[in-house]
């Protein structure tokens, strides 16, 4: 079976709470680090999540 072109990444909260989302991204089409604004339940706000080490 061929290996897919998607890799598992972790999105780490920029609020410093240590909260992490796990998702996948296409390693061929998106070379830059992913940044998304998502909900962090530890601070009860939407904050910026940046791609960190898995």
Curated annotation (Swiss-Prot):
Q: Which UniProt keywords apply?
A: Ribonucleoprotein, Ribosomal protein
Name this protein carries in UniProt: Large ribosomal subunit protein bL33B
* The organism's place on the tree of life at top rank: Bacteria
Entry-linked SUPFAM superfamilies: Zn-binding ribosomal proteins
Which family does the record assign? Answer: Belongs to the bacterial ribosomal protein bL33 family.
Q: Name one GO biological process term.
A: translation
Gene Ontology CC:
cytosolic large ribosomal subunit
**Per the record's keyword annotation, is Metal-binding included, yes or no?**
no
InterPro entries documented for this protein: Ribosomal_bL33, Ribosomal_bL33_CS, Ribosomal_bL33_sf, Ribosomal_zn-bd
Q: What is the lineage of its organism?
A: Bacteria, Pseudomonadati, Myxococcota, Myxococcia, Myxococcales
Gene Ontology terms, MF aspect: structural constituent of ribosome
